[in-house]
């Protein structure tokens, strides 16, 4: 991580420590580490300006870039409250016009960072982001299915693997996952309402899990086989191994037929 410390020396040591932890311990990809870096650097530059008395209307990209936070100490970080984070999210929405998905990613980064300082570094007694909510995202449905068709498809699920299949279809309908991304989901990729998926080129991305997804995952995990060959895999086949792409394809086609759609 030495290269990262040098490359990221314009952020406080606590952010550098976090980047080290996420890279060396959590094994996050280089692109994900850079996203954490940019998200946190921007957030703390904004927070410094906010606490210096600047109004949102006066904070622009040029001012953000000029703001030095490299020597920011733990006392400043301890002074951050939930209200400050709410103001930051409002700035992202109203001034920068960030999309809900972008704001959701930045919330996930902030929550991970403050959780690290609270439970790993143990330099914070109170986590200001513990009650920070993820922006509500619109439900994402495949373009070729209407809402009624989607509901009909979900209602067609039954059988021995009902909870598993319902969870798979719910994630497909709400999260816009590729087939390869879905079958490669591991148990540890799910953190509360955030799902980390590995896409093309081993690129990681974070996806917000709405209530329907969270309920489906919880219901499936409650009945998921425990004595399996691949313990990390979320979706398990009847042989106790990670579910395969072909199995999912056949399953989806079956329920489309049951729901009286054309496959």
Please name every model-derived segment:
Residues 1-263:
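Conserved catalytic core of the tyrosine transesterase superfamily
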């Amino acid at each position: 991580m030495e290269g990262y410390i040098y490359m990221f020396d314009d952020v406080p040591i606590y952010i550098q420590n976090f980047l080290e932890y996420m890279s060396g311990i959590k094994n996050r990809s280089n692109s994900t580490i850079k996203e954490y870096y940019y998200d946190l650097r921007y957030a703390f530059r904004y927070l410094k300006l906010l606490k210096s008395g600047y109004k949102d209307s006066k904070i622009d990209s040029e001012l953000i870039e000029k703001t030095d936070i490299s020597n920011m100490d733990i006392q400043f970080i301890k002074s951050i409250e939930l209200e400050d984070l709410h103001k930051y999210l409002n700035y992202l929405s109203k001034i920068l016009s960030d999309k809900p998905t972008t704001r959701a990613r930045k919330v996930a980064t902030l929550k991970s960072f403050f959780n690290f300082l609270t439970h790993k570094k143990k330099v914070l007694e109170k986590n200001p982001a513990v009650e920070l909510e993820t922006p509500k995202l619109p439900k994402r449905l495949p373009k070729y299915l209407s809402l009624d068709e989607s509901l009909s498809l979900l209602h067609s699920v039954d059988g021995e693997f009902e909870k598993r299949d319902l969870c798979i279809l719910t994630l497909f309908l709400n999260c816009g996952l590729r087939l390869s991304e879905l079958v490669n989901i591991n148990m540890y990729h799910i953190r509360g309402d955030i799902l980390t998926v590995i896409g093309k080129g081993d690129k990681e991305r974070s996806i917000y899990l709405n209530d329907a997804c969270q309920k489906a995952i919880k219901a499936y995990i409650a009945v998921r086989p425990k004595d399996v060959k691949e313990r990390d895999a979320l979706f398990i086949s009847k042989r106790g191994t990670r579910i395969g792409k072909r199995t999912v394809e056949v399953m989806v086609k079956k329920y489309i037929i049951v729901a009286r759609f054309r496959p």
